[in-house]
Amino acid sequence: KETNIYNHDLKRKKINAHVIVIDYGVKVNILRSLYSRFSKISVVPCTSTYDDIISLKPDGVFLSNGPGDPSATGEYAIPVIKKLFKLNIPIFGICLGHQLLALSLGLETYKMHQGHHGANHPVKNLSDSSVNITSMNHGFAVRTDNLPKNVRETHVSLFDGSNCGIEVIDLS
């Protein structure tokens, strides 16, 4: 695969930022959503190196969704994500990307007894107690029973209490 720049023309005020999408299986609607918010999106293959990514001069990195066990990508994804932390730029992810971010921080993932699949999944924001109705399709979750002091849980599933979001407070 090669690096692609996604330029879908939507009429919305955008944040002037170049976000690199690491493609672990990203869906087109995710790219549309990102491009509606940021001025430039570059999609790179999941096997891209740290040097490949920084050569694009990112303002942020998005770790995409994708299939399967997050620990199976440890040989190529985790080392790159750990190096990206040194850039001190926003790194965010959904689904598999969220799980890879957690693994890169030393957290663990586990296979869920019953995965989350489909629409209408209520997720609680622990910062303000608001609830969003989401669509999900994953069978793994992040274990949060032993979070380091620099990581906090931000979102949980109201179906089973499993983790749906984390935030790194300090990388130093």
What label would you give each PLM region?
Residues 60, 65-144:
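Cysteine-nucleophile active-site neighborhood
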Residues 3, 14-15, 57, 87, ...:
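Residue-level preference for short coil/turn positions at secondary-structure junctions
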